């Protein structure tokens, strides 16, 4: 039997709420979303205005499956108390991290800027850029060397002088989390026949593997029979904010 146009128009996929930003499409499966995408942005979306996000192209992606709860991954991301013992290579690129500090605002008396070390061009295995520096960046953004945007609960973006790395997080089970890391570069870099992003990819993979190891150790510790609760160090105020954000979600 032939169907009418009206009947076929009603046979589409179920509608979902979606927002396009920065070259990504974000989906919210809630029937009536209570939170808009930008409301969870930390800091505001404008922090990445000088990066040409919409035109960047994917050079490489890597999928990890971590044996930990998704909240443990975020707790690890939101502090650098673990950095000196876990990320020695990263601490050489960002001296502030040697002080167990994620940002200079945690301890202004440290007198160490939240920026890459002198002579460092980018987050790569040899500290040198693997692509042309984005011409739209300010001198301060180039000097800092890394600008972060956090989009709880599913993504953070690390913007560097020559590339952008975005990390997406998805819970699979109560103790398993999928993490997808993507390295994005300008079309000009991608069109260059000599372009080789491997040093940026290798460095990002190193950091994520180090984080995965401590996250999985933490998960196993939560299963220890004597465990009741943990304690936050003074440097972990962002973790406290995360706990309060999550508790707020659970109370609504």
Residue ranges of model-derived segments:
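C-terminal catalytic domain of Rieske-type non-heme iron oxygenases
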Residues: 17-252
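Short Fe-S-cluster ligation motifs
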Residues: 1-27
